[in-house]
Each structure stands twice: as structure tokens, then as C-alpha cells.
Design a protein with these regions (language model features):
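Membrane-associated feature with strongest affinity for ZDHHC
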Residues: 1-287
Length: 287
């Protein structure tokens, strides 16, 4: 993962325009394909075999999977459509007051003073309010105004892949694929060698899906843990200092807005943020 991350950062720095031209659509198509695949695999293949299609439990799983898929895509779309740039501030807020001018810094690219915690993004080509990072899956920067959507995006991606993993595991245990089926690497070797054994192909399919599912839930889980730590300290991806940490309740309110954790229900829930992202209260340090 570190090698992949370094490789992506290298190409991003080399040619930002070309990078986002390909990285954004590829990432979004991949996410869409993965969501549709896991939903279809679980609802139309695994669950009918495990619990049938007549009972209430199957219908409940349908609803849960639909809610998860909706929140993945709705939060992703909200991230994409929300403007976090400094330029969105009212004109009177683009100029710092006398008592806060020392907290602002000059952006060489934008040629202007920008608020604290605002940083320039070479992909968006503007300064972002409380910039966290640029996300290729949402094709936008994650900042003050859309951080809430990004957190729930990572939450529901993790939840969805975790539910799929549990269902996959139950299916494989039912048919003893984990216990008696050939090992994953051995399956690939046999498949490449051209074996026509139906059991080998059957186990290969299940093992490939399970391995991809395991990788997906691990990657999404790492993202979720990282974002949880950021919210806990009111920090950002590149700035982990605790100078803006005002306590868990206030930190949640700053990122999630007035509705707080109820925003997990849907990105359409109105939840005004406590401020516009230009002024940040520092933590009081008692000596």
C-alpha cells in the first residue's frame, strides 16, 4: 500500500492535470462497479442460498443493503457537489480583522491572504477551507463544508464491505470451501494450467471474491479509523496537532453540524455548521 501511495503521489506531482483526468473517472467507475457487484453478489446469489427469499430476514437484508448503497453514493455525490474553496466566503470575510490578521497566511498560488487551516490544492487549483486532503473517489477536496459527507462515505463503505464479508464467510463455511477447498494460490495455479475441474473453478471464484472483499474492507476500515481519529482531535489528514481540539462533543459539532451524529441517516439531513471555516478557536492549554 505504501508503494502504491508513493507511486500515485509521484504521478500526481509530475502532471496534476493529467493525473486527475484519469484518476477521477477510473476511481469513480471502480467504486460504482464494486458497489454494484457486492450488492448483486450478496442479494441475488449468497442470501437466497443461505436464508431463502421468502422470509422477513431476506427482505430486511434487502433494505439494509439498499440503505448502505444509497448512503455510499449520496454522500459521495454530496462531497463532489459541495464547494469548500476560500472563494465561496462572502467578500467581507475574505479580509481578516485586525485581531486575526496574524493568524492568516499568504498563498503564493492564489496571490491572497487565506484563513488559518486553509491550504492550496494543486488539483482543485484553489485554497480549501480546513483542507483535509484531495479524494480521487469524490473528485473533490475534503474540507470544512463536506467533511461530514466524507466521514459517512467511509463509514458506509466500511459497513457495506463488512456485511458482504460476513455473508461471504457464512456461505464459504456452509459449503466447507474454507476448510476443504484448495488454497487460493493453488486455485490460481490450477486455473492458469487449464484444468477443467468444475470444483477447482468453483472454489477459485469464491476465493477470488472473498479475497477482494477482505482487501476492500481492510482498506475502507483503515480510512474510517483515520477519519475517526481526525474527528476525535479536530485535526486534518496532514496536520495532526491537537491545537484545535475542543473536546469530543464540540469537535463532532464542528464537523457534523447542528444535527450531530444524526447525520448518519442521510446526507440530505439539514445540519448547519457552527461557523464558515474562516475562524478557528484554539484549545486552551492550562499550565
Amino acid at each position: 500500500m505504501c508503494v502504491l501511495s508513493d507511486l500515485l503521489q509521484y504521478y500526481a506531482k509530475t502532471d496534476p492535470k493529467k493525473f486527475i483526468r484519469y484518476a477521477h473517472p477510473i476511481s469513480i467507475v471502480f467504486l460504482f462497479a464494486a458497489t454494484v457487484f457486492f450488492f448483486t453478489w450478496e442479494v441475488f446469489f449468497l442470501l437466497p442460498d443461505l436464508i431463502g427469499t421468502e422470509g422477513w430476514f431476506y427482505k430486511a437484508n434487502w433494505i439494509v443493503d439498499l440503505v448502505i448503497a444509497y448512503n455510499v453514493w449520496a454522500n459521495m455525490l454530496a462531497c463532489y457537489r459541495t464547494d469548500c474553496s476560500v472563494a465561496r466566503l462572502p467578500k467581507d470575510r475574505l479580509v481578516p480583522g485586525p485581531d486575526e490578521k496574524h493568524l492568516w497566511h499568504h498563498c503564493e498560488d492564489c496571490k491572497q491572504l487565506v484563513p488559518p487551516r486553509s491550504w492550496h490544492c494543486k488539483f482543485c487549483r484553489c485554497c480549501i477551507l480546513k483542507r483535509d486532503h484531495h479524494c480521487i473517489f469524490t473528485a473533490n477536496c475534503i474540507g470544512h463544508n463536506n467533511h461530514r459527507y466524507f466521514f459517512w462515505f467511509t463509514f458506509y463503505v466500511t459497513l457495506g464491505t463488512a456485511v458482504a464479508l460476513v455473508t461471504n464467510f457464512a456461505y464459504m463455511v456452509k459449503y466447507n470451501i474454507l476448510l476443504h477447498g484448495p488454497a487460493f494460490i493453488f486455485n490460481i495455479f490450477i486455473w492458469i494450467s487449464g484444468s477443467n475441474s468444475p470444483m477447482v473453478k468453483y472454489n477459485l471464484k469464491e476465493n477470488v471474491v472473498f479475497s477482494f472483499n477482505l482487501f476492500s474492507v481492510a482498506l475502507a476500515g483503515i480510512m474510517l479509523v483515520n477519519q475517526t481519529c481526525i474527528i476525535y482531535r479536530n485535526a486534518s489528514f496532514y496536520k495532526r496537532e491537537g491545537r484545535y481540539d475542543l473536546g469530543l462533543r464540540k469537535n463532532i459539532n464542528i464537523i457534523m453540524g447542528k444535527a450531530g451524529l444524526w447525520t448518519f441517516l442521510s446526507p440530505s439531513i439539514k445540519s448547519p455548521l457552527p461557523h464558515d471555516g474562516a475562524q478557528w478557536q484554539l484549545r486552551k492549554i492550562i499550565k
